[in-house]
A protein has these predicted regions:
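Conserved class I S-adenosyl-L-methionine
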Residues: 1-36, 47-51, 66-71, 152
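C-terminal lobe and adjacent flexible extensions of AdoMet/dcAdoMet transferase-like proteins
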Residues: 201-213
Length: 213
């Protein structure tokens, strides 16, 4: 679709200020913990690629949107890594991988656009090995009753139309908790350089607590 191709073309320029001011550092800090066999869901245009450390053995990057995936494939082809990188068209809701095959799953700015966040998180848990980790950066809904939450609710529909289906008012923390992930270890951050309605973030690594639920 034309709208998908346009969004894929403007995605990196639109995020550029936020990447320089905050998100690039957030990505680097989070992905320093990646190791072993890694799956990144909703990899988009591949902005995480340059941040993966050499502790990764193999990286699979999945992106269901064809226009985004075309940009991702070009980025993969243009970057040298000490590990193999495989591009998959799989959506997060229906991952074509056996149970327990990944040491780490990465989700950065993905769950806001997932067609079914609950199913996506169930799939993440399924493909993680026992003791594996979910590394995530997700923007979230403002505190209940806050001015920000009211603004997000008011602008949710036009923002979703503009931003490729992104739900600025989604309660992602609730989805994580409902899926059995412990959210206590997540820290809150701010996405500087981006509109206020997507500025609140949760960031963290969920490890063995995934399997204690």
């Amino acid at each position: 679709m034309l709208v998908n191709r346009v969004f894929a073309a403007i995605y990196d320029p639109f995020l550029a200020l936020g990447e320089r001011r905050s998100m690039g550092q957030q990505r680097a800090g989070l992905l320093a913990a990646a190791k072993g066999d890694v799956l990144e869901i909703g990899a988009g245009t591949g902005l995480n690629l340059r941040h993966y450390p050499d502790t990764v053995n193999a990286l699979t990057v999945s992106e269901p949107d064809a226009a985004m995936r075309a940009v991702l494939q070009r980025r993969v082809a243009g970057i040298a890594t000490p590990f193999a990188v495989t591009v998959s068209p799989a959506p997060a809701e229906a991952l074509p991988f056996p149970d327990g095959v990944f040491d780490v799953v990465v989700s950065t700015l993905v769950l806001c656009t997932a067609g079914d966040p609950a199913a996506s998180l169930d799939e993440v848990r399924r493909v993680l090995r026992p003791g594996g980790r979910l590394l995530l950066i997700e923007h979230v809904r403002g505190a209940d009753g806050s001015r920000l939450a009211r603004r997000q609710r008011r602008l949710a529909r036009p923002w979703r139309a503009f931003a490729g289906g992104c739900r600025c008012d989604q309660d992602t923390v609730r989805f994580l908790s409902d899926a059995g992930f412990s959210v206590a270890s997540l820290r809150t951050e701010s996405w500087a350089g981006m509109p206020a309605i997507v500025s609140p973030l949760v960031v963290g690594s969920i490890g063995d607590d995934v399997w204690a639920c």
